[in-house]
């Protein structure tokens, strides 16, 4: 893609079978855990987007040998820990990457300075830095811990920490810091969030104890853990699969299958919600890959209706609300999405940008402080807008999907950032029959 915009135009049905790109969360973690481990870690199916590649480069900065051996195939030679980097660690746009890396780095007697692109530098890091500081790490940076900042680690104390918000990133940062904390750590999670870190720590040889106490998850990582290199097969990313699948639901006559999608119940809230809206979504060929359940998902054009999305479902679909809002724009009735204030501190204020983009395309949207309501008419929205994405890849892809089924074309201003999570997005959609061209 070039610096030009990108335009999607309504056309005929979408048909075909595609494979979802590797899961972004697991790709980040495979790099970080591989660098922390002793010995060789091999990865297949890695998402080779800009965010994950920034994490790979960061691991090199901390002393790991990281090499690409083929498309999606990588080898990490870990040293059993992190060394002090000789230069600033630039994490690009990778919010997951920088938060998890800071947690891992806090366990070692080193000093590291982190920065990122303009979007990442605007995002607060205090939610991760606060528990790390309670464990004994120190940091120096801007208001609310915004990048750039310098972190000094080592000599960490154990910690029992109750998450003040549902955040897998904060949980993971504490667990990674706890690998080298005296006394280990316990994270108390009032609302369940994605559990990839717990699963992958076990795969690398760590003891992780998870208990449900009255509906509250307690995750304990005893002291003295050692990680050993392993093989990771990265499943398809459900957050990325959402885009071609929703396209299949809203473009008349379409049938789209996405193969190899991870079906972890803490990541599939969108699919549950779409089915409640009346979507024809069929999951088949369910199997296990590297400790995660995966399957193939087929979406057929559907006449959907509005629903009230339970706020407690938000952690299982927090990145999918923009594309859910697109589906809701074609549904009949109101789709109510509340309890999603976390969207305001993602790569952009996703509540505001989703509402603004849909309204520009003729959709009636009611924005609230902690969510929004889409008033669907059951008809294709007008479209015809140039949507400002503010550098947010999910806002960009969501509105391009809308344009494939709207009454007239929809353009977005900055397609380049789509590569952070879904390199090949435009090519995949064209392969299914979608009309995407430079604007």
Curated annotation (Swiss-Prot):
Q: Does the keyword Amino-acid biosynthesis apply?
A: yes
- Catalysed transformations (reactions): 3-phosphoshikimate + phosphoenolpyruvate = 5-O-(1-carboxyvinyl)-3-phosphoshikimate + phosphate
Q: So where does 3-phosphoshikimate get bound?
A: 24-25, 29, 167, 169, 319, 346
Disordered: annotated span:
1-23
What highest taxon heads this organism's lineage? Bacteria
Protein's UniProt keywords contain Cytoplasm: yes
Give the matching CDD domains: EPSP_synthase
What is the protein name given in its UniProt record? 3-phosphoshikimate 1-carboxyvinyltransferase
In its UniProt entry, the species of origin is given as Caulobacter sp. (strain K31)
Write the lineage as a comma-separated list: Bacteria, Pseudomonadati, Pseudomonadota, Alphaproteobacteria, Caulobacterales
């Amino acid at each position: 893609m070039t610096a030009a915009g990108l335009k999607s135009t309504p056309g005929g049905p979408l048909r075909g079978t595609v494979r979802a790109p590797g899961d972004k969360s697991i790709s980040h973690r495979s790099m970080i855990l591989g660098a922390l481990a002793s010995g060789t870690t091999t990865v297949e199916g890695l998402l080779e987007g800009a965010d994950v590649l920034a994490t790979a480069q960061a691991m090199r900065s901390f002393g790991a040998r990281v090499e690409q051996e083929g498309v999606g195939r990588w080898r990490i030679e870990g040293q059993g820990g992190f060394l002090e980097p000789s230069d600033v660690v630039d994490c690009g746009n990778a919010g997951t990457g920088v938060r998890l890396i800071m947690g891992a780095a806090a366990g070692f007697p080193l000093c590291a300075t982190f920065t990122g692109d303009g979007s990442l530098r605007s995002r607060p890091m205090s939610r991760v830095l606060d528990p790390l500081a309670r464990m004994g790490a120190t940091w120096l940076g801007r208001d609310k811990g915004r990048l750039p900042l310098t972190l000094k680690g080592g000599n960490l104390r154990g910690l029992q920490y109750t998450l003040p918000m549902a955040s897998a990133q904060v949980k993971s940062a504490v667990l990674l810091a706890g690998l080298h904390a005296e006394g280990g750590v316990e994270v108390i999670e009032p609302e369940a969030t994605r559990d990839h870190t717990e699963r992958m720590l076990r795969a690398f040889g760590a003891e992780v104890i998870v208990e449900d106490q009255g509906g509250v998850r307690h995750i304990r990582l005893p002291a003295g853990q050692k990680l050993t290199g392993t093989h990771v097969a990265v499943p398809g990313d459900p957050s990325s699969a959402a885009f071609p699948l929703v396209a299949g639901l809203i473009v008349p006559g379409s049938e789209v299958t996405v193969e190899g999608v991870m079906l972890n119940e803490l990541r599939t809230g969108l699919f549950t919600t779409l089915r409640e809206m009346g979507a024809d979504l069929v999951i088949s060929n369910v199997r296990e890959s590297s400790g995660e359940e995966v399957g193939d998902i087929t979406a057929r054009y559907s006449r959907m209706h509005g629903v009230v999305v339970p706020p407690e479902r938000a952690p299982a679909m927090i990145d999918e609300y923009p594309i859910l809002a697109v589906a809701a724009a074609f549904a009949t009735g109101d789709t109510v999405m509340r309890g999603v204030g976390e969207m305001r501190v993602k790569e952009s204020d996703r509540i505001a940008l989703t509402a603004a983009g849909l309204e520009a395309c003729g959709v009636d949207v009611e924005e609230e402080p902690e969510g929004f309501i889409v008033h669907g008419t059951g008809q294709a929205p007008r479209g015809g807008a140039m949507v400002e994405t503010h550098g947010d890849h999910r806002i960009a892809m969501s509105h391009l999907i809308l344009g494939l089924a709207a009454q007239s074309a929809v353009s977005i201003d900055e397609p380049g950032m789509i590569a952070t999570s879904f390199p090949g997005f435009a090519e995949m959609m064209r392969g299914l029959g979608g009309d995407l061209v430079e604007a």
